[in-house]
């Protein structure tokens, strides 16, 4: 199943991720499908929900498009955001849905349009989650500001649903200088993605650091890195890689 995360913007205007060039603007036109996809594509739309205010015309939404480009189904929720949506081995979907200062992670059954289970975390604005198997969920915990210490505790954790515990944790300030991206603040890393990439390795996307990294879960070492903080010729505050 192909997956794509589409994040609706919170402002009335739409800003492209690349510089706008009027001469290159040819307008929007229908695409042409030259061959069918291998399966459906599920898109998550962020929706609009801010400080208790919602816009009924901009709900958080999951949309499934079949292999031939036709709409299969939609699933809307109000008072929430949808970020990552990932396929699970059983054909269901893993969804990250922040709301009101917490994050709800749930398994969604496309056939019944119902949640199989859900977990609530005291985490704000969580974009990236990933299923690692054996009831383990990796969570990119951004905006984890430690006000009393004046430092960022932004991290990636692995939560085990079977035992209701965090069993692995990787904190960015243990691996980056404090002056990275201008120094600690309440959105220091904006880590927006976590994905398993091989045996015991995670791909992380600290957006504000202009880089994507691979971390060995056993040694906790950064074993691969693409990009450097401030070098926008390689990556410039990327979204999910």
Task: Spell out what each predicted region is.
Residues 1-23, 194:
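Secretory targeting signatures
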Residues 35-38, 87-90, 131-134, 196-199:
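Residue-level detector of Asp-centered blade-edge/turn motifs that repeat once per structural unit
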Residues 52-59, 98-102, 147-152, 187-189, ...:
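Short, solvent-exposed loop/turn segments at conserved positions within beta-propeller repeat blades
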Residues 58, 80-81, 124-127, 152, ...:
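Beta-rich catalytic cores
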Residues 66-69, 108-113, 160-164, 216-220:
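Short loop/turn segments that connect beta-strands within beta-propeller blades
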Residues 70-131:
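Blade-loop segments of beta-propeller domains
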Residues 77, 116-122, 163-189, 220-236:
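Surface-exposed loop and turn segments in beta-propeller and other repeat-based domains
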């Amino acid at each position: 199943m192909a997956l794509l995360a589409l994040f609706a913007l919170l402002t009335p205007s739409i800003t492209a991720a690349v510089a706008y060039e009027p001469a290159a603007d040819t307008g929007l036109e229908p695409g042409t499908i030259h061959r069918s996809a291998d399966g459906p594509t599920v898109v998550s739309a962020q929706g609009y929900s801010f400080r208790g205010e919602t816009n009924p015309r901009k709900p958080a939404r999951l949309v499934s498009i079949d292999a031939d480009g036709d709409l299969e189904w939609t699933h809307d929720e109000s008072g929430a955001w949808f970020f990552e949506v990932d396929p699970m081995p059983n054909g269901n979907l893993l969804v990250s849905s922040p709301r009101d200062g917490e994050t709800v992670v749930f398994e969604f059954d496309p056939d019944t349009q119902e949640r199989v289970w859900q977990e609530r975390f005291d985490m704000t604005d969580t974009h990236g989650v990933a299923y690692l198997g054996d009831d383990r969920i990796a969570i990119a915990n951004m905006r984890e500001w430690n006000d009393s210490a004046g430092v960022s505790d932004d991290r990636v954790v692995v939560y085990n649903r079977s035992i209701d515990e965090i069993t692995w944790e990787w904190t960015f300030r243990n691996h980056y200088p404090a002056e990275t991206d201008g120094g600690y603040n309440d959105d220091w890393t904006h880590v927006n993605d976590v994905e398993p990439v091989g045996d015991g390795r995670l791909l992380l996307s600290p957006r504000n650091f202009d880089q994507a990294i691979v971390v060995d879960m056993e040694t906790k070492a950064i074993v691969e890195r693409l990009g450097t903080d401030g070098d926008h010729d390689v990556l410039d505050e990327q979204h999910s890689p």
